[in-house]
Design a protein with these regions (language model features):
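Aromatic-lined substrate-binding rim segments of carbohydrate-active enzymes
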Residues: 91-176, 241-260
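Catalytic-core regions of glycoside hydrolase
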Residues: 40-85, 140, 218-226, 230-376
């Protein structure tokens, strides 16, 4: 299988904002390499050992629990009040204290009720717009990022999930009946549908292609439940399958250049089937097509032993640490009930354990707290009341948790002199920090800083270009030696510090280090005092 590979040779520009940025040279070794020991034997250096923080929630990008919401009629306007006073097996808790993201999943017609009219615009006051603002404002107040999925297919729904203006413009589609209600869905290969949907996604990206606010955008919005399976094409067969996949994947990759995009690695991706054991090679090829355009991966049937089985596990293994994984459980307590016994589960506590175990096997970065309009039942309630230990265990062990257990730095240097620093990094989580996805393009880097001893602000920053955070996986520490000159550094007393910076934001801290002590308010890890002569 051809895996996506990314080579980044970027020159770091010098930015004099709050600090002077200086680059140097470095070399590295895996920790189990015997040559590593020589990297620590540096005259004039002191070796600083760091204790890890293993349990605290870290709101680092693309990891953690995803809190599900929505903008349909089932969403209550007091959602945040209910979730801030949520029942758990250990008493009342605030759900946001355990999550990193609010996931807003909704009908295209709710996001875009009229042509050119969107619920994020000022003055739009539909019920979905009111719910949307409530969720977005509440997320901001609680330090959560946003994530989105759009659904265009109306099957199993009680109203049209594609806006009426699309049908009125002449898009072709089909009718189905949900209960006593007839609903209409467009054919995904219809050119008018594609034109209108492309305009919606373009306008959405103009607003939300912003990693400071948005965690990810998930799926194509096509097929049953928006999960990219059971599609119905105008041809009556799967002939348009490849062309439609090429169209929508290229469109999203072009629009979302800064925010991760995610595709469901479904065995029937973009086909007319919901489940099938044939044609798996073609499905794999289509998923790879998306991966190679920069898509990350998700699946929506974790814990369901039929719909997530050997093929899904095998495909996930081929992409392990090449793309991050987001999981969603498949079983729904309110609708599936006793069906879980067919998978060998006696109750939903066992379902939660099954989902957790499957997620760990796939090295997922994010797990789901799905929504139910009755907060006293459903998946989120189940996690917090029958498996609260697993909620906390995922925070401690899932995703990525990065820290340098050992750093060798000089305690006395001369201005303009050469510095040699050895540093070793570990990942305590089972996932990985996906700096190799094109939307990030290795923007997160290791940096060392000379901090002002009074303010603890960086005066000089030195970015080590060589380490790739995506290479740090559990059980495989990475050691590096970084050499640079203190050209232009004024003499004085400073504090050595290390941080994981965002090079697109003037080297501000971008990822929290998982250290127990010694972190500044901004996230720099203090190492030792240093005198520059």
């Amino acid at each position: 299988m051809k895996l996506f590979k990314e080579i980044s040779n970027r020159l770091l520009s010098i930015a004099l904002v709050s600090s002077l940025i200086i680059t140097g040279t470095s070399c590295s070794d895996d920790d189990n390499n015997s040559g590593t020991n020589n990297l620590w034997d540096i005259s004039g250096n002191t070796v600083v050992s760091i204790k890890p923080e293993r349990y605290k929630l870290q709101r680092n990008p693309l990891q953690g629990w995803v809190i599900y919401g929505g903008i349909g009629d089932g969403m209550m306007m007091n959602f945040w009040d209910l979730y801030d006073n949520f029942e758990s097996s250990e008493g009342q808790v605030r759900v946001a204290d355990y999550g990193t993201t609010i996931y807003i999943r909704g009908a295209w017609s709710d996001f875009n009720p009229e042509e050119g009219v969107y619920i994020w615009q000022d003055g739009v006051d539909t019920k979905p717009a009111q719910r949307f603002r409530m969720l977005v404002n509440g997320a901001k107040e609680r330090g959560l990022k946003l994530a989105f999925t759009f659904v265009t297919d109306s099957r199993d729904k009680h109203y049209n999930f594609t806006p009426e203006y699309v049908k009125e413009a002449g898009a072709q589609g089909f009718e189905t009946t949900t209960g006593s209600v007839k609903v209409w869905s467009p054919y995904p290969d219809d050119p008018i549908f594609q034109e209108k949907y492309e305009q919606f996604l373009t306008d959405f990206a103009a607003k939300y292609n912003n990693p400071d606010e948005v965690q990810f955008v998930s799926g194509f919005g096509l097929g049953k439940w928006g999960e990219t399976h059971t599609l119905k094409y105008s041809t009556g067969d799967d002939t348009p399958r490849y062309a439609v996949t090429e169209w929508i994947s290229s469109l999203m990759a072009r629009l979302f250049t800064k925010v991760p995009i995610v595709i469901n690695y479904h065995r029937c991706i973009m086909s007319g089937k919901e489940y099938d054991n044939s044609g798996l090679e073609e499905s794999e090829n289509l998923i790879n097509l998306c991966v190679n355009k920069g898509f990350s991966l998700r699946h929506d049937a974790f814990g369901m032993k039929t719909y997530y089985s050997n093929w899904e596990r095998g495909y996930a293994a081929t992409q392990r640490f090449n793309r991050p994984f987001i999981m969603e459980g498949g079983w729904v307590e309110s609708s599936h009930g006793g069906s879980i016994k067919g998978d060998g589960y006696a109750n939903f506590a066992e379902v939660r354990q099954g989902e957790f175990d499957e997620a760990k096997g796939a090295n997922v970065n994010m797990m789901d707290l799905r929504f139910d309009s009755n907060v006293n039942s459903g998946e989120t309630h189940s996690w917090f009341n029958t498996a609260f230990n697993l909620v906390k265990k995922f925070i401690a062990e899932g995703g990525y948790r990065l820290y340098p257990d050992k750093v060798s730095v000089p305690t006395s240097v001369t201005t303009g002199g050469k510095v040699s620093i050895t540093h070793r990094w570990s990942n305590l989580g089972w996932g990985y920090c996906p700096t190799n996805i094109p939307q990030w393009n290795q923007k997160y880097k290791v940096a060392f800083a000379l901090l002002d001893k009074t303010t603890e602000q960086p005066v000089y920053t030195f970015v080590n270009e060589e380490p790739r955070l995506c290479d740090w996986v559990h059980g495989s520490p990475k050691t590096y030696n970084y050499q640079f000159s203190l050209t232009g550094v004024n003499s004085g007393e400073y504090i050595w510090a290390v941080g994981l910076v965002d090079t697109t934001k003037d080297n501000a801290i971008g990822i929290e280090i998982s250290a127990k002590d010694g972190l500044t308010d901004e996230g720099w890890l203090k190492l030792t005092d240093v005198t520059v002569r």
